[in-house]
Amino acid sequence: MHYPEPISKLIDSFMKLPGIGPKTAQRLAFHTLDMKEDDVVKFAKALVDVKRELTYCSVCGHITENDPCYICEDKQRDRSVICVVEDDKDVIAMEKMREYKGLYHVLHGSISPMDGIGPEDINIPALVERLKNDEVKELILAMNPNLEGESTAMYISRLVKPIGIKVTRLAQGLSVGGDLEYADEVTLSKAIAGRTEM
């Protein structure tokens, strides 16, 4: 189907988002065309602002407007425990349960040799640097229960154990192959309470 160039560009742009195929992208593009111009401008500004106004915390790697992030700045947090997660959505999921009071470290991915992603390609070197702090006594590995998550957890466990820091893994109950961000608060709460040492 031939579309005017602006519509084609918009469809192509929407298709870059995860889970958006050609039909959904087309539907979104035509919906955008029907929106009021000021709503479209606000939408476009929100997209640009997300890229311009957010950064990654220099301590934990979580998205933030201020560096360090509000979690790392919170003096009430238990600084002896760091929960390692794959991405920012996992921090948000963990924070929703309101039970975990430690700090986080966001890897921004997982080890995936099939995709050419090794330990140096994600935020593992910064984690190792953080662990030189004597305050850290436990590392909770909260990777997704899939092959890449398990590989990443095993790699970090082997890397950290010689340092003498306790390494634990979330209890099962999270479905294998699932994503942490989709787990409900009760499941996450039980997984953190029942974590096991690696």
From Swiss-Prot:
A molecular function (GO) term: DNA binding
InterPro entries in the cross-refs: DNA_Rcmb_RecR, Hlx-hairpin-Hlx_DNA-bd_motif, Rcmb_RecR, Rcmb_RecR_Znf, TOPRIM_dom, TOPRIM_RecR
SMART domains: HhH1, TOPRIM
Keywords tagged on the record: DNA damage, DNA recombination, DNA repair, Metal-binding, Zinc, Zinc-finger
One BP term from GO: DNA repair
Membrane recorded as keyword: no
Zinc finger map (C4-type): 57-72
Tagged with keyword Iron: no
Domain of life: Bacteria
SUPFAM superfamilies: Recombination protein RecR
Toprim domain boundaries: 80-175
Biological role stated in the UniProt entry: May play a role in DNA repair. It seems to be involved in an RecBC-independent recombinational process of DNA repair. It may act with RecF and RecO.
PANTHER family reported for this sequence: RECOMBINATION PROTEIN RECR
HAMAP family in the record: RecR
Family, as annotated: Belongs to the RecR family.
Protein name: Recombination protein RecR
Gene designation: recR
